[in-house]
UniProtKB/Swiss-Prot annotation:
Organism encoding this protein: Cervus nippon (Sika deer)
Cystine pairs: none
Protein name: Fibrinogen alpha chain
Domain comment as written in the entry: A long coiled coil structure formed by 3 polypeptide chains connects the central nodule to the C-terminal domains (distal nodules). The long C-terminal ends of the alpha chains fold back, contributing a fourth strand to the coiled coil structure.
Coiled coil among keywords: yes
Lineage: Eukaryota, Metazoa, Chordata, Craniata, Vertebrata
Amino acid sequence: ADGSDPASSEFLAEGGGVR
């Protein structure tokens, strides 16, 4: 997953970040 969004940072750990 990409870390484009600041809030996605926590999503990255779960593998659900913004692409």
